[in-house]
């Protein structure tokens, strides 16, 4: 397989969908981004694409209730899934989101990988683990990004990464763990390299 390097700065908004049934047809390759409502998902997407307002960041966690799709190249899509786990969201809506997320991860044929974002200071909450379980049971590779890494010293950061790497061993899936900071540009290159790898079958000669 030839090594590719996509230009994520060219990424543009494609469409929004209220639920999985409304997502455009199941073609090409999609990579999904998931995380708790305050994990910094939109910020990470904006840092990857070097666009301040590509994914709207909200002062109110849980605001992203739509599934947002972005196109990097024709047939190469990034999918921003609704943030989960925010206390102020009505219980019924939370249950609906979780059902929809599980359905998407397990049934979407063109889904090639899942990026789960977690605050490095509070990783592996119940819903994060649920996302990883769904992905592993669907044989979906996972990149765990420990966001807001700039909030910790380098030694504390390394300790957290090591702890999470050990904690995920029982999942027995294809899971990579990296520290990430949009502010200090930590881990953006690793994120781009993983996305390139997941998209590469489209460009295989």
From Swiss-Prot:
Protein name per its UniProtKB record: Probable GTP-binding protein EngB
UniProt-listed GO biological process terms: division septum assembly
GO terms, molecular function: GTP binding; metal ion binding
Sequence similarity: Belongs to the TRAFAC class TrmE-Era-EngA-EngB-Septin-like GTPase superfamily. EngB GTPase family.
Protein residues bound to GTP: 35-42, 62-66, 80-83, 147-150, 180-182
Keyword annotations from UniProtKB, A to Z: Cell cycle, Cell division, GTP-binding, Magnesium, Metal-binding, Nucleotide-binding, Septation
Superkingdom of this protein's organism: Bacteria
Function noted in UniProt: Necessary for normal cell division and for the maintenance of normal septation.
Cofactor(s) required, per the database record: Mg(2+)
Binding site residues for Mg(2+): 42, 64
Cellular component terms per the entry's GO annotation: cytosol
Record's signal peptide: none
Gene: engB
Coiled-coil residue windows: none
Domain annotation EngB-type G: ranges: 27-201
Gene3D superfamilies: P-loop containing nucleotide triphosphate hydrolases (3.40.50.300)
PANTHER family with a match to the protein in the record: ENGB-TYPE G DOMAIN-CONTAINING PROTEIN (PTHR11649:SF13), MSS1/TRME-RELATED GTP-BINDING PROTEIN (PTHR11649)
């Amino acid at each position: 397989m030839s090594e590719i390097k996509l230009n994520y700065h060219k990424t543009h908004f494609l469409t929004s969908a209220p639920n999985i049934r409304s997502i455009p047809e199941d073609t090409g390759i999609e990579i999904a981004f998931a995380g708790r409502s305050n994990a910094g998902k939109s910020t990470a997407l904006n840092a990857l694409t070097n666009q301040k307002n590509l994914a709207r960041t909200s002062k109110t966690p849980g605001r992203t209730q739509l599934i947002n799709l972005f196109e990097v190249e024709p047939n190469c899509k990034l999918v921003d899934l609704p943030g989960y786990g925010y206390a102020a969201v009505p219980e019924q809506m939370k249950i609906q989101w979780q059902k929809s997320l599980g359905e998407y991860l397990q049934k979407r044929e063109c889904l090639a990988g899942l990026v789960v974002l977690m605050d490095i200071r509070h990783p592996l909450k119940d819903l994060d683990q649920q996302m990883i379980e769904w992905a592993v049971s669907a044989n979906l590779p996972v990149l765990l990004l420990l966001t807001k890494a700039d909030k910790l010293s380098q030694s504390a950061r390394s300790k957290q990464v090591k702890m999470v790497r050990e904690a995920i061993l029982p999942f027995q899936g294809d899971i990579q763990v990296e520290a990430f900071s949009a502010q200090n540009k930590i881990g953006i290159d690793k994120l781009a390299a993983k996305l390139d790898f997941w998209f590469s079958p489209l460009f295989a000669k």
